[in-house]
C-alpha cells in the first residue's frame, strides 16, 4: 500500500507538471511531452516551486560539461517539480534524431538556427530547464526563455570543464571547426553566458552536484529576496520599538546619497559575504576582471545592478585604459616583501581602481529625472581620478552628472595640481581652496548636511548633491578586489599556498584603502596583520597605539606624501562601527566629540580588539627619501613617497615570518621633485614633462607612465578657479557651477 500510494502520488505530480509544457512543431499543432519523472525519495521540504519562484522557471545555463542536466534533476527532486532537458526533451523529440546527428546533418550555423526555432516554439512554467551549451548563442530564443524564467549560470573552471569533457568522450561541440581547440571554444562562449544570466553559481573544483544544486537554490533565494541586503548609517541607533527597515537603504540609495542624513557613513546591515576555500582556489587562475565580477556580484544585489550589466561595467572600467593587462600586478621586491602596483590606471594612482568603475555604477543607480552634482575633496590623487572617471561616461550620462573637485591650493604637489587642473572636462571642474584637505572634506560634509541649501538646489535647479570620496560606499567597495587579487597572485606565482597568511602594509590617511583590506579578510582572504603606515601626520598611528584620537595642538604638516596628509580620517568611523558591533550610539558620541572637542578616547576593550589585527608606525621625511634611494640602488625600483613610507614602516614592524604586501598607491612620476631629491639628481626648474623625461632616462622599474606623460604636455596652461576657505564661498561656487551645467 505504501509503495502504491507513493507511486500514485508521483504519477499525479508528473501529470500536473507536464500538463503545462507544450511544444509546437511544423508537424504537430500541439503535443504533450512525456518523460519519466522519478524521485529516489519523497521528502518533506520547505522548498516548493510556488514558494521559491512561483510560475517562473529555473533555467540552468552553462557550457558543455557544467553539469546542468544532473543538477537540474537534483533541483527538481528537491522542489517537487518537473525537469526539462532541452537536448532530450525538446530538440530530439522535435527533430526525431539525436543532437549529434542533427549537427552533422546541417552544420554549425544552421544548427543554431534550428535549435533556436525549436526553443521558440516551447513554453513551460514552474519547471527546471537545463539548456544546451549553445542555446545562449541564439538571442531570440533566450529572450523568449528569459520572459518567464530565472537564468542561473553554472560557472565551472575551464580546466575542470576540459577534464569532464574528456571523461565524457566529447570531442566536438557546436561551433568547433578544425583547428579550433576545445579550450579556445569554451573561452569564446563565455561572452554569451555572461550576457544572459540573472544569477551566477561559482562551481569550485571538486564540488558535488548536490552542493551545486544547493548553491543554485541559495542563489535563487537571494535573487528573489530584494530586501535582504541593505545598508545602515554608522550612527544608526536600533530602538526596541523600531524595525530595521525604517532607516535601511538599498545599495543604489547608499551610492546616490553618499553620506547618511545623520552624518554617518553607510555600511552593510549584515556581514560581508564570504567565499569558500574552494571558490577562492578556483579564482587563482582567473583574470582581474573575472575576480572583480565574482566578488562584486556577491556584494551588490542584482535588484540594484543586474549581474550581466555589472559585468559589462567591470569590463569597461578595466579595459584598455589600464597600461598593464594584469590591472594591479604584484611584484617581488626583496626578501619577504612584495609590491602591489596600483598605479597603472589613467591617472597613475590607486584611486583609478575604484574611480574607473564607480561612475558607471553611479550612472546606473540614479533616476533619469534628476541631475546630480558630485562634490569631491581631494588631497592629491582623488581629484584627477574622479574627473577622469566621470569624463568617460556616455554623452547622455555626462549631461546629467557633473563633478567638482575641491583641493587644497597649496597642499598638493605641483604635478598633482597640474593633473587635477588638466583633468577638467565638459562635466568636471577643479577648484583650489586656500586651506588644507581636512577643511575641504569637512566643508563637503557640512554642505551635504545643510538641508536648506541642498533643498534649494533640488527645487530651483532640479539638482541633487552626492559624493565620490571614499565616504561613498560605491567608491570604497571596488578597492576590496585588488587586495584579494594580490593574495591570489602570490598563490598563482607559487610564493605561497592558499591558506598561508600574509600581512599588508598600506600608507594610510583617510583609512579607506586599509579598510578595504579588512573587508577582503572578511570575505575569506587570510590576512594576518594590517600595518598602518603614516607620515609626519601620524594621528592614526597614535590612535592605534593608544586608542586616543587627538587633534588638539596638532597641525597638518605638508610632506613628500601629500595624499596621506590628513588628520580627520573619515573611514575610521566605519571600522570602529564594525569593531563595536554596530553600536551607532557610540559612533555618534565619539565623532560628535571629535567635532566639538577635537578628540575622543575609546575603551580599553576596543583598543585591545583593534591591536589584535592592526600594527602602526610612522616615517619621517628623511627616512622616506632614504628608502627611495636605497631601494633604487639595491633593486633598480623607484618607490613613490607614499610607498616609501610604507616600506620604512614594514621594515620596522613586520616580523618577516610571512610575506608582506606593500600597497604602492601612486606612480613615482607624480612626485618628480621628491624623487629627484631622493636620488640626488640636480633639480632643474623645468616643466613637469621635462622632469618625467629625465627620470625616464634612468630606465628604472616601473617604467615611465606614458598616460601621465601625455597629459603633462597638455595641462600646464589650463585655467581653474580658486576660492577662500569659507563655507558660503564654497556654496556659491557650487551653485554657480550647477547653473552653468544644468540650466
From Swiss-Prot:
The modification N6-acetyllysine is found at residue 281. GO terms for cellular component: cytoplasm; mitochondrion. Keywords: Acetylation, Pyridoxal phosphate. The keyword Cell cycle does not apply. Belongs to the threonine synthase family. The gene is THNSL1. HAMAP family: Shikimate_kinase. CDD domains: SK, Thr-synth_2. It comes from Homo sapiens (Human). This is Threonine synthase-like 1.
Amino acid at each position: 500500500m505504501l509503495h502504491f500510494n507513493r507511486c500514485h502520488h508521483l504519477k499525479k505530480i508528473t501529470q500536473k507538471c507536464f500538463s503545462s509544457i507544450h511544444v509546437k512543431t511544423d508537424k504537430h499543432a500541439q503535443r504533450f511531452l512525456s518523460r519519466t519523472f522519478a524521485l529516489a525519495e519523497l521528502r518533506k521540504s520547505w522548498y516548493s516551486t510556488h514558494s521559491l519562484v512561483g510560475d517562473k522557471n529555473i533555467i540552468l545555463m552553462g557550457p558543455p560539461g557544467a553539469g546542468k542536466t544532473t543538477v537540474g534533476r537534483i533541483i527538481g527532486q528537491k522542489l517537487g517539480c518537473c525537469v526539462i532537458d532541452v537536448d532530450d526533451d525538446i530538440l530530439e523529440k522535435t527533430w526525431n534524431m539525436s543532437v549529434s546527428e542533427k549537427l552533422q546533418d546541417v552544420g554549425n550555423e544552421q544548427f543554431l538556427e534550428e535549435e533556436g526555432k525549436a526553443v521558440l516554439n516551447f513554453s513551460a512554467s514552474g519547471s527546471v530547464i537545463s539548456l544546451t551549451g549553445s542555446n545562449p548563442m541564439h538571442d531570440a530564443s533566450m529572450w523568449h526563455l528569459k520572459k518567464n524564467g530565472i537564468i542561473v549560470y553554472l560557472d565551472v573552471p575551464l580546466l575542470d570543464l576540459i577534464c569532464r569533457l574528456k571523461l565524457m568522450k566529447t570531442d566536438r561541440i557546436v561551433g568547433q571547426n578544425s583547428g579550433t581547440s576545445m579550450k579556445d571554444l569554451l573561452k569564446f562562449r563565455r561572452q554569451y553566458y555572461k550576457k544572459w544570466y540573472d544569477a551566477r553559481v561559482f562551481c569550485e573544483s571538486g564540488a558535488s552536484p548536490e552542493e551545486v544544486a544547493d548553491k543554485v537554490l541559495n542563489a535563487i533565494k537571494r535573487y528573489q529576496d530584494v530586501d535582504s541586503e541593505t545598508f545602515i548609517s554608522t550612527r544608526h541607533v536600533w530602538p526596541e520599538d523600531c524595525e530595521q527597515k525604517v532607516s535601511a537603504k538599498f545599495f543604489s540609495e547608499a551610492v546616490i546619497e553618499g553620506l547618511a542624513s545623520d552624518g554617518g557613513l553607510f555600511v552593510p546591515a549584515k556581514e560581508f559575504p564570504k567565499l569558500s576555500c574552494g571558490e577562492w582556489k578556483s579564482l587563482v587562475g582567473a583574470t582581474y576582471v573575472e575576480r572583480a565580477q565574482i566578488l562584486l556580484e556577491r556584494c551588490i544585489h542584482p535588484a540594484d545592478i543586474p549581474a550581466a550589466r555589472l559585468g559589462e561595467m567591470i569590463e569597461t572600467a578595466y579595459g584598455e585604459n589600464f597600461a598593464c593587462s594584469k590591472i594591479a600586478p604584484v611584484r617581488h621586491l626583496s626578501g619577504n616583501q612584495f609590491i602591489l602596483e596600483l598605479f597603472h590606471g589613467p591617472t597613475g594612482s590607486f584611486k583609478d581602481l575604484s574611480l574607473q568603475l564607480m561612475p558607471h555604477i553611479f550612472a546606473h543607480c540614479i533616476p533619469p529625472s534628476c541631475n546630480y552634482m558630485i562634490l569631491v575633496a581631494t588631497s592629491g590623487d582623488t581629484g584627477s581620478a574622479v574627473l577622469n572617471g566621470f569624463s568617460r561616461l556616455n554623452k547622455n550620462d555626462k549631461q546629467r552628472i557633473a563633478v567638482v573637485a575641491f583641493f587644497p591650493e597649496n597642499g598638493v604637489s605641483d604635478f598633482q595640481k597640474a593633473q587635477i587642473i588638466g583633468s577638467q572636462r565638459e562635466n568636471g571642474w577643479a577648484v583650489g581652496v586656500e586651506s588644507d584637505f581636512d577643511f575641504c572634506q569637512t566643508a563637503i560634509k557640512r554642505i551635504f548636511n545643510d538641508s536648506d541649501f541642498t533643498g534649494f538646489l533640488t527645487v530651483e535647479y532640479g539638482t541633487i548633491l552626492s559624493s565620490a570620496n571614499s565616504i561613498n560606499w560605491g567608491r570604497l567597495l571596488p578597492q576590496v578586489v585588488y587586495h584579494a587579487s594580490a593574495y591570489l597572485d602570490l598563490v598563482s606565482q607559487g610564493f605561497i599556498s592558499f591558506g598561508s597568511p600574509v600581512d599588508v602594509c598600506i600608507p594610510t590617511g583617510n583609512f579607506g584603502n586599509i579598510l578595504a583590506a579588512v573587508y577582503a579578510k572578511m570575505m575569506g582572504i587570510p590576512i594576518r596583520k594590517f600595518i598602518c603606515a603614516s607620515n609626519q601626520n601620524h594621528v592614526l598611528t597614535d590612535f592605534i597605539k593608544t586608542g586616543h584620537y587627538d587633534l588638539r595642538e596638532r597641525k597638518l604638516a605638508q610632506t613628500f606624501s601629500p595624499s596621506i596628509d590628513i588628520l580627520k580620517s573619515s573611514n575610521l568611523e566605519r571600522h570602529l562601527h564594525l569593531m563595536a558591533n554596530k553600536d551607532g550610539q557610540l559612533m555618534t558620541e565619539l565623532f560628535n566629540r571629535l567635532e566639538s572637542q577635537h578628540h575622543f578616547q575609546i575603551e580599553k576593550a576596543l583598543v585591545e580588539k583593534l591591536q589584535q589585527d592592526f600594527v602602526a608606525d610612522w616615517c619621517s621625511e628623511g627616512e622616506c627619501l632614504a628608502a627611495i634611494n636605497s631601494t633604487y640602488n639595491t633593486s633598480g625600483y623607484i618607490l613613490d613617497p607614499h610607498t616609501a613610507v610604507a616600506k620604512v614602516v614594514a621594515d620596522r614592524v613586520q616580523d618577516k615570518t610571512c610575506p608582506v604586501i606593500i600597497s604602492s598607491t601612486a606612480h613615482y612620476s607624480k612626485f618628480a621633485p621628491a624623487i629627484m631629491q631622493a636620488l640626488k639628481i640636480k633639480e632643474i626648474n623645468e616643466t613637469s614633462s621635462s622632469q618625467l623625461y629625465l627620470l625616464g632616462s634612468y630606465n628604472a622599474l616601473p617604467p615611465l607612465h606614458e598616460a601621465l606623460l601625455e597629459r603633462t604636455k597638455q595641462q600646464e596652461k589650463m585655467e581653474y578657479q580658486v576660492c577662500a576657505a569659507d563655507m558660503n564661498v564654497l556654496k556659491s561656487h557650487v551653485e554657480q557651477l550647477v547653473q552653468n551645467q544644468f540650466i
